[in-house]
A protein has these predicted regions:
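Alpha-helical membrane-protein architecture signal
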Residues: 142-150, 159
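Membrane-anchoring alpha-helices and their flanking helix-loop junctions
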Residues: 1-139, 167-195
Length: 195
């Protein structure tokens, strides 16, 4: 997780620098598609991974994130571990990953429309992470969260993340029919993690 966080930090630094130096040379649509979108995603992923790093590293009563229980089912562990490195590389052999947040949707206006939708959904995903606060964790129960994004739905991060994956799969589907079945497999794994 620390690796992801630092990678996102360095990506953010590069995207921020590129955005500042290139702002005046692009039309607004091109600037959005080339720089702004990547900058926003870098910020979202950096904040998300920073929260989870903190949640994994620190556990204390005064943080209200003491582990109350650990998932004791084999299926809970299997489905959770299958989604994260290094095990996700094995999962990807059976369900090849075809989704890509940075994919092009065709012309500039389609890109803007779908990328705004992706930003909205990933903002919901980030809102869910922030709602967890110091309780961020994947395989431990640190208390039921019923505030923030969790006030509206039980698994807002899983729902928004899966919707982003399906949206970014749209350009791939015309050339790769198996991508549809593969994404059903990934969505099923996240459904199993949620129940």
């Amino acid at each position: 997780m620390l690796n992801f966080m630092f990678n996102n930090l360095f990506t953010l630094k590069g995207n921020f620098t590129d955005s500042i130096t290139s702002f005046s040379t692009f039309s607004l649509i091109d600037f959005f598609n080339v720089y702004f979108f990547q900058l926003v995603l870098s910020i979202i992923f950096l904040v998300d991974t920073a929260y989870f790093c903190f949640g994994y590293i620190f556990e204390a009563g005064f943080l209200k994130n003491k582990v109350k229980s650990v998932d004791c089912t084999y299926s809970g562990w299997i489905f959770a571990l299958a989604c994260y490195p290094p095990f996700s590389s094995i999962t990807s052999m059976y369900f090849p990953w075809s989704s890509n947040e940075y994919i092009s949707f065709g012309d500039n206006f389609e890109n803007v429309f779908f990328r705004i939708l992706i930003i909205i959904l990933l903002s919901i995903y980030l809102f869910a992470t922030i709602s967890l606060g110091t309780r961020c964790s994947n395989l431990t129960n640190r208390g039921i969260v019923i505030t923030g994004a969790y006030k509206f739905v039980r698994h807002p991060a899983y729902i928004s993340k899966n919707l982003v994956w399906w949206i970014t799969l749209i350009p791939v589907l015309k050339d790769n029919n198996f991508a549809f079945l593969s994404m059903i497999g990934w969505s099923f794994m996240y459904f199993m993690r949620a129940i």
